[in-house]
Amino acid sequence: MWLLLPILLYSAVFLSVRHIYSHWRRRGFPSEKAGITWSFLQKAYRREFRHVEAICEAYQSGKDRLLGIYCFFRPVLLVRNVELAQTILQQSNGHFSELKWDYISGYRRFNLLEKLAPMFGTKRLSEMFGQVQKVGDHLIHHLLDRQGQGCPQEVDIQQKLRVYSVNIIANLIYGLDINNFEHEDHILTSYLSHSQASIQSFTLGRLPQKSSYTYRLRDLIKQSVELREDHGLIRKDILQLLVRFRNGNEVSGDKWQLEPINDADKLLSIKRLAKVAEDLLKVSLDAVASTVTFTLLEILQEPLIVEKLRAEIKELSNENGQLKFEELNGLRYMDMCLKETLRKYPPLPIIERVCRKSYSLPNSKFTIDEGKTLMVPLLAMHRDEKYFSEPMKYKPLRFLQTANDVGQCEDKTKSNVFIGFGIGGSQCVGQNFAKLVIKVALIKLLQNFHLELDANQVKTLKVSHRPAPFIHTKDGLKVKLKRREINTKFYS
């Protein structure tokens, strides 16, 4: 009798797993060959712990526009065609979303981000530009001070840019007037090492995680909000607009002062406001730092590109060392370089969405059932020769814009292949803010320093997506800095 129990248990598990691994075949979708074999279980392991690389391998394994795959015991539908991905994510009318109901009652995260999108309009960004530029100056002062103290000229620029990103977040999202290059023991500086040591499992890493950092970051938000609501502090930053939204005030327009309402009527509790801020912290930290890092990695191998960028930057007025917001849009060649960086090293390598109600694919017999996961592998698409010639070569001029051309890609007929900041409901609402922060860092570094890469480092440099999905260089990026002679008024 007792011998039957393990046999029955094993049989139940075996049949259950086999049923899961036959999901796409039973529904008639093109799918990979799945089974309880050692080779397939290795694939499942790789998709769990080396998620990005394994999904890219699945993208390259066939020619079907759709492919049913399995991430551990989770059926996932992989989209391998750009036009189909755009159709699904742009025209599916709410069939797909990123998360369950969150933040505030009556809002999905998708809709909440739509409400907050006006915070990142041109008018608002121009008024926040002074704060961004001040943080950029902190970065340059720190690097100049290291040289002045006789320290080695070689620095890990990736780590410095992560601190720069944290400073941006601290000053504009958490409302703190702080320079983390000087306050190395601050909680937001400590968060850098905490985020790098997060869970490596892709599935487990998405589960709600509470740590002492969550509560300490919430305390920062609580203190900053109290200063604004109870003491009338007005500061032109993102937090000020979040607090306006919390009080039911418009975030568009040109008003910064609060019109407080009763606590019972507030749209966001402190807890949920802190969750919004922490999510912005997680996304912005790696997106900004990685984009600037990989731009430097590529352009420093091409002196002609650096020369063109410096010539473009030289045309900026730069009065008393200060940039003008309205002039940054005229940096066309820098825009091309950033697009090429985002193509080759997208901060969001995979878009993952959950079907919230059954969706019939256009011009197809297939239907995606509610609850099933859809993946769009941006990294693999951006490096596909079908869409971009010489995909591993850094070619900013592939995005050259002309008067009669939208300027997506010069060497292919596909006009909408580039998806640098997402697509449809997954598009980053803060992309204009991110571009602004990235441009300020690049301009100030190229203005103030001659930068040089070690050729041997470039040969051995490894790009990593661990923890998934963020992209970074595994061992940092060492760059030799030499101060450039510029206008003495720049730092008077």
UniProtKB/Swiss-Prot annotation:
* Gene3D superfamilies assigned to the protein according to its UniProt record, in alphabetical order: Cytochrome P450 (1.10.630.10)
Q: Which GO terms describe its cellular component?
A: endoplasmic reticulum membrane
Domain of life of the native organism: Eukaryota
For activity, the cofactor(s) needed are: heme
Q: How does it sit in the membrane?
A: Peripheral membrane protein
Enzyme Commission code(s) on record: 1.14.-.-
What the entry lists under CDD domains is as follows: CYP6-like
Annotated GO molecular function terms are: heme binding; iron ion binding; monooxygenase activity; oxidoreductase activity, acting on paired donors, with incorporation or reduction of molecular oxygen
Q: Where in the cell is it found?
A: Endoplasmic reticulum membrane; Microsome membrane
Q: Which top EC class is named for this enzyme in its record?
A: oxidoreductase
Q: Which InterPro entries match?
A: Cyt_P450, Cyt_P450_E_grp-I, Cyt_P450_sf, Insect_CytP450_Detox
| Binding-site residues, heme | C428
Protein's UniProt keywords contain Heme: yes
Keyword entries, A-Z: Endoplasmic reticulum, Heme, Iron, Membrane, Metal-binding, Microsome, Monooxygenase, Oxidoreductase
Entry's PANTHER family? CYTOCHROME P450, CYTOCHROME P450 310A1-RELATED
Role played:
May be involved in the metabolism of insect hormones and in the breakdown of synthetic insecticides.
What's this protein's family per the entry? Belongs to the cytochrome P450 family.
**The name this protein goes by in its record:** Probable cytochrome P450 310a1
Source organism per entry reads Drosophila melanogaster (Fruit fly)
Q: Which gene codes for it? A: Cyp310a1
